[in-house]
Design a protein with these regions (language model features):
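Short, acidic, metal-binding catalytic loop of nucleotide-sugar glycosyltransferases
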Residues: 192-202
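A recurrent flexible, glycine/aromatic-enriched loop bordering the glycosyltransferase active site
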Residues: 46-70, 311-332
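Conserved donor NDP-sugar-binding/catalytic core segment of glycosyltransferases
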Residues: 10-47, 271-304
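A conserved acidic beta->alpha catalytic loop
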Residues: 10, 209-219, 237
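Acidic donor-binding loop at a coil-to-helix junction in glycosyltransferase catalytic cores
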Residues: 85-94, 347-354
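Glycine-rich, basic loop-to-helix element that forms the pyrophosphate-binding segment
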Residues: 1, 235-253
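Short beta-strand-to-loop acidic/aromatic patch adjacent to the donor-nucleotide binding site
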Residues: 1-12, 255-266
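Catalytic beta-strand/loop signature of glycosyltransferases that borders the donor
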Residues: 105-117, 291, 365-371, 376
Length: 481
């Protein structure tokens, strides 16, 4: 067995901890085992449990703890299969390769104590992956993840469905969707930010007031003097943020495009809505994601500043989306499609689930200029989460990834069936038909003479690749009887 310790500080193993890890390894025949642990922070010991590894646990920052035990034979074999010379993604690549062949088993027992020096709150750690100084790291992580997806059949080639925006008619071109519960300190700012938008099209603001009790409802009623504000109090009392979204997008007054605005955030200026809607048409996409700036309650910029998700690429963004923990904000959707999918009725990860689902078929548009201000304050639901809540959230997102990855693999299998049948037919013919065999062999040689040509017309400009194939001139003497 091979034990890997990823910290540089003192490690204190529990009584018979290594023996227990070996025991579980032998019982499960896992490729790797990892365990819950204690963390010592400023001299105080606290429990730091980890979570089970799932098929879709593709985050490169998945928390295994600092102690991992590997089967040495599996470890060496997977290292030998690695062609890339990674500087940063070596361990991530190794774990993905091992997961293709063996299980990664979580021992939910506290087997060691580690010294923890990163004492930042959960709300501060969640943006590490978009820090510009980590860009080289992220490029390697994306490469490793993409290779893993190709190996397991979950990789999607950059082919997308087009969107027909004239398929349905709407009274409004756009609707700003604001779910809210008990945000009396911020709801007026959010609604006014939406109503102040200047656009070339009609829009409205749909606020789903999820039974507020702090004066939010009364504040919204005061703002309803503007006829563009639609104030909805749901009949149901079991709705999360996703359920509130479903209530809004299925409302008869919802516009063609549904644009997010959280109840404690604001748009950067009066042009955000126009910019978001324009992007749908300019990029022919079913979902648009903008760029936001982190601010304090008074809307002054604070670290980490601008979050633009420039790791996204049109070609590989939807594959890399399975690795990263978020897609950005604000998010906007083509309402007709969103009504078909519906939003998971949760208050965490519902937007991420939509992004994965939509991107599997359609292109996601991007805006890299700041259009949104995300206010961080003590009232944020994710400002400082307990480890148990962080784990709960991560389990759910990993489950979302697992479901989406399983779906993508099934779709790829269906797509490959006709191609496999064609290749099988060609293989059978080249074995039983000598002339066909000779012609295919000759074709491979002719391909080596391929040339690139540029063709330009009145309305088009394209590159054409040509190569000679004189065997096509001759009859293949095929018989049809």
């Amino acid at each position: 067995y091979t034990l890997l310790y990823t910290k540089h500080t003192e490690l204190k193993l529990g009584l018979f901890a290594l023996e227990r890890m070996v025991q579980i390894m032998e019982m499960t025949q896992a490729g790797m085992v990892y365990a819950d642990r204690y963390q010592q922070v400023n001299g105080i010991r606290k429990a730091a449990p980890v979570i089970d590894y799932q098929f879709g646990s593709l985050r490169d920052d998945f928390d295994f703890g600092s102690v991992m035990l590997f089967q040495s034979e599996v470890f060496k074999k997977m290292v030998k299969t690695t062609k890339e010379d990674y500087q940063y993604a070596g361990l991530y690549d190794l774990r993905l390769k091992i997961s293709q062949k063996k299980k990664l088993v979580h021992i939910n027992e506290y087997l060691y104590t580690e010294i923890e020096n990163d004492t930042r709150k959960s709300g501060e750690k969640q943006f590490d992956y978009v820090d510009p100084k980590n860009r080289r790291v992220q490029i390697e992580m994306e490469q490793a993840c993409s290779e893993h997806l190709k190996a397991i059949g979950g990789y999607l080639e950059p082919c997308f469905q087009s969107v027909n925006f004239s398929a349905s008619t709407f009274e409004y071109e756009a609707s700003v969707i604001i779910p809210v519960r008990n945000r009396i300190r911020t709801i007026r700012d959010a609604v006014r930010s939406a109503l102040n938008q200047q656009t070339s099209f009609p829009f409205n603001v749909i606020v789903i007031d999820n039974h507020s009790t702090d004066g939010t409802t009364e504040a919204l009623r005061e703002l309803c003097t503007d006829h563009r504000l639609v104030h909805i109090i749901p009949e149901r009392n079991d709705l999360g943020i996703g359920g509130c979204w479903n209530t809004g997008i299925h409302h008869e007054k919802c516009g063609k495009f549904a644009i997010q605005l959280d109840s404690d955030d604001v748009y950067k200026d009066e042009h955000t809505l126009q910019i978001m809607v324009n992007a749908f048409y300019e990029q022919n996409c079913a979902m648009v994601i903008g760029t936001y700036m982190m601010t304090d309650f008074n809307m002054k910029e604070m670290a980490p500043g601008i979050i633009d998700h420039k790791e996204w690429t049109p070609e590989n963004g939807r594959n890399n989306a399975l690795r990263i923990n978020g897609l950005g904000a604000p998010r906007a959707f083509y309402t007709s499609l969103l009504r078909e999918i519906n939003v998971p009725n949760t208050s965490y990860g519902e937007d991420y689930a939509l992004g994965l689902c939509i991107s599997s078929n359609y292109q996601i548009g991007r805006i890299y200029d700041v259009v949104y201000l995300c206010r961080r304050w003590e009232g944020n639901s994710d400002a400082a989460l307990a480890i148990e809540k962080v784990n709960q959230n991560n389990v759910y997102k990993d489950r979302i990834r697992t479901w989406e990855l399983q779906r993508r693999i099934q779709v790829n299998k269906i797509k490959l069936k006709p191609q496999k049948a064609i290749l099988q037919l060609i293989e059978e013919q080249t074995h039983s038909w000598e002339l066909a065999k000779q012609n295919y062999q000759a074709l491979e040689e002719y391909r080596k003479q391929m040339k690139k040509m540029s063709l330009a017309g009145k309305d088009f400009d394209m590159l054409v690749y040509t190569f000679p194939n004189p065997k096509r001139i001759l009859s293949a003497t095929a018989q049809t009887d």
